[in-house]
């Protein structure tokens, strides 16, 4: 209340699922500071998650590929924006440097900050440690701003063209459509592919479902193997392998159009929850209480 907040930065460049879970912060900022200009520092690969968001005025791309010159340009951009309020929701060394570079009069982080990132902040939000579920941790921003009574909404924008594509895909497949994502960033988070195949075959055989397999380009080999295993179990069934063939907007569209999603603890799990599709999440080394949508 003691400063005139006109420019706000959210620094959360990486971690697919966590970016999705932190999107409701934008609605809180819009409620508390309706006239402020809001920017988000985001990695190239995840920029689609925030592009065209109604609560965002600008996304600033963070790229690891550009070397020191790119890094210097990013820090200069952050400094020149003259932000009044900054939230570091990543809490790593690199985001601590970004946060400090803004020279904003108010810089706030989370108790999960490590690698010295907390030193760049004027304060860390209480009850935002690792013992708190991730989605609750990010919503502490809203509570700090006095608007925690709001219903958290991701506010993801799915273009009409992507929705139309997904609708056509679902109609062509026919019946109930179940999306499956067998991948995850950590190997220890990945449920055995054979188990996914058993579930997929059961959905086809017992419920007449069609399957859509999703994932990144790196996961296409795994989804191809999954399709092969499923079709060993059932003589008939529609299984479409879309892994590596969709951007994040199309992924959101197909997950939104599906009747259900079966997935490991991963970014697509949180994206499916954000667009309102029922999710069956498989947690191996993590827990639903801390990491669930």
Model-predicted regions and their roles:
Residues 1-293:
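Catalytic machinery of carbohydrate-active enzymes
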